[in-house]
Amino acid sequence: ECKEKYMCGIAGFYNAKGNYQQQKEKWASVLTSMHECLAHRGNDESGIYLSDMTGLSHARLSIRDIVTGKQPIIRQKNGKEYAIVYNGELYNTEELARDLRQSGYEFSTTTDTEVILYAYMHYGVDFVRKLNGIFAFAIWDDSKKQLLLYRDRVGIKPLFYSFVSGQLLFASEPKALFCFPGFTPRVSMDGMREVLAIGPARTMGNGIFDDVNEVLPGHYLIFSENTMSDHTYWDLFRAPHTDSYEQTVETVSFLLRDSVTRQMVSDVPVCTFLSGGIDSSIVTAIACRYMEKHGETLNTFSFDFKDNDIYFKSNAFQPERDLPYVRIMLDHYHTNHTYLECDENTLFSALRDAVDAKDFPGMTDVDSSLLYFCSLVKKHNKVALTGECADEIFGGYPWFYRKELLERYGFP
């Protein structure tokens, strides 16, 4: 289960030998330009933080604590400042906040951003192991004169960085890096090879452009005077599956319900994408029951292409149309459902916007259709849970289970 939600944008820079305050207006303007490049990720609010050695900027899509949750968030301890810009969502905010309150911390917001900053101040750099969620964030620690970049375990939230004239730059998207004076985009040879050979995929850490790197999933970076260190706090491992079929069903059921329920926590209404497939139907069923318990009705959306009923052809990926299964779901669950449709001209016109949104070549009409439909859904809901990525996790694609594809020789 994956979500189309919580898309704030973060950006900034760091120079251990810098003195940004001497030219405050200039560097504040650079920070503003960087978050303006990310305004499509969140245009509810924006903010900047500037010290002698670092600058942080944030473009906010307000989901939690809409009134007092503006970023960057700045706190003090023993006369030293700590600042954070954050993109993501925690699913164990209350548990962490409870432990921190017992240790004497007082919260002035209900955001998970403040919880993360206090957790760092209290537990130290490895606090990230306690986080359950999706995130990319930067923390400035004035007590140690260091900047830290963190990324979630599987890389749901993007975070790129580069070095220009001895300065560290970071941002949610490469385009914001190129707002820094003197840094222009240039595709690297390795990046071009990957685009042509395995695109739209790319190897982890490859930013496609020259001198653009990506913080690896499950990693955090520490930048201080003359040093940069890369730390792994989580890594995927494999082990024999010894559970029985019944135990496996029970475990997967618990994990799905726990995951979806935790992601329903929001200060704005949550909806789901309902394609009629198994993945989105399970997410919708769990979300619908959650909403019913709270006396609310879930908004659901399904998407189709104009004249798909005429031109649809069965294939290995989609043996039959989804629409009949959407109707079956709606017979079983009471939701506020909206059918959305897209024609080929709209799909084509959104192609450039889709590439611009990702800064990389992508899945062509898959990306452009999703971007277009999301723009329609946003008129009703800011937060959407989807069934995206379930095929990757549960082996839903044909090459996971069809014998002739498993045994085929070839690359990729």
Kindly give the residue locations of the regions a language model identified.
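Short loop/turn hinge sites at secondary-structure boundaries
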Residues: 199, 359-361, 412
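Short glycine/serine/threonine/alanine-rich loop segments
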Residues: 335, 360, 382
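Active-site adenylate/phosphate-handling loop in enzymes that bind or generate adenylated species
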Residues: 153, 347-350, 364, 371-412
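Residue-level signal for short amphipathic helical patches enriched in basic/charged
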Residues: 91, 361, 380
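Cysteine-centered catalytic environments shared across enzyme families
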Residues: 5-357, 370
